[in-house]
Amino acid sequence: MCDEDVAALVVDNGSGMCKTGFAGDDAPRAVFPSIVGRPRHHGVMVGMGQKDSYVGDEAQSKRGILTLKYPIEHGIVTNWDDMEKIWHHTFYNELRVAPEEHPVLLTEAPLNPKANREKMTQIMFETFNAPAMYVAIKAVLSLYASGRTTGIXXXXGDGVTHTVPIYEGYALPHAILRLDLAGRDLTDYLMKILTERGYSFTTTAEREIVRDIKEKLCYTALNFEREMATAAASSSLEKSYELPDGQVITIGNERFRCPETLFEPAFIGMESAGIHETTYNSIMKCDIDIRKDLYANTVLSGGTSMYPGIADRMQKEITALAPSSVKIKIIAPPERKYSVWIGGSILASLSTFQQMWISKQEYSGASIVHRKCF
């Protein structure tokens, strides 16, 4: 199925990064930020070929003169014009394919509004003329990638976190829980606590610098109080980071205070359960007979699950909530940043999946997506 002439395209549009490539490959071909940037200033030089908008890496590299916008917020597309630009960029610039020649597998957040799915379907068929398409739920794909059909997937991305219990390949919708706390909120929180240290980050471009600091230096503490005490007593936990202009900043307890928000949403004023409690609550909404299987197959995925120490901390927190005799296993595959994409690549290349596509012939109106994709 790796025959690129007919291979399906797998496009995992995240709130933060877009992962895209061909079905049957073991990793995405292109990964770029889901951003559209527009110039903040007027062009004064003629012949520079200035554009009115930039997408992805190009927007990132020119961020100093642009205002950056993310068209996907909390896992849901909020700006369709910009989203179309991102898809156009995906097909024509990153993958260099004609979308009218390949089936397209898209991903979506669980509990995605119906109108969103319909709009995706409409754009794929009417704007890009795709021959066939399918919309799959991210968490189901990440479980696929780990080689399981039963388990609970805790997918923590840039815009949204959810826990999705899956039994024998079926998502259990009544037990899906969604937490609007994810990577972007952690970046904002890190911006705030760095301000307390005297470093000011305010613009959309500076936020990207803070995101980089977060990705390079943050980690999850196993015991928050003990870690705070260690940080106060010595400078052993301090790390330095060089800003683009050459200044060096030092960060200490911010390294673990930032990700701690995942377990303690009150840090950012959110009245909600942390990811450990959300996972537990999700399991408790399932039938009593399948809970044991879910505890033993808790799969982490998404970029926000990449903090060192997060799996051990989850293990500790869920063990404290669950019955003492039950076996708890947290699976954190090393490629979990891309496991949704990898699951999509596996799914779209299965021979049994080929009759699942919604074809252009079947498309008479966008509501078909609810009948074929579940």
From Swiss-Prot:
| N-acetylaspartate PTM sites in chain numbering | D3
What EC numbers are recorded for this enzyme?
3.6.4.-
Chain positions listed as propeptide in the UniProt record = 1-2
Keywords of the record, alphabetical order, are: Acetylation, ATP-binding, Cytoplasm, Cytoskeleton, Hydrolase, Muscle protein, Nucleotide-binding
Q: Which CDD domains match?
A: ASKHA_NBD_actin
Its annotated compartments are: Cytoplasm, Cytoskeleton
Enzyme class, one word?
Answer: hydrolase
GO MF annotation terms: ATP binding; hydrolase activity
Q: Which family does it belong to?
A: Belongs to the actin family.
Name the UniProt record assigns to this protein: Actin, muscle
| Lineage of producing organism | Eukaryota, Metazoa, Echinodermata, Eleutherozoa, Echinozoa
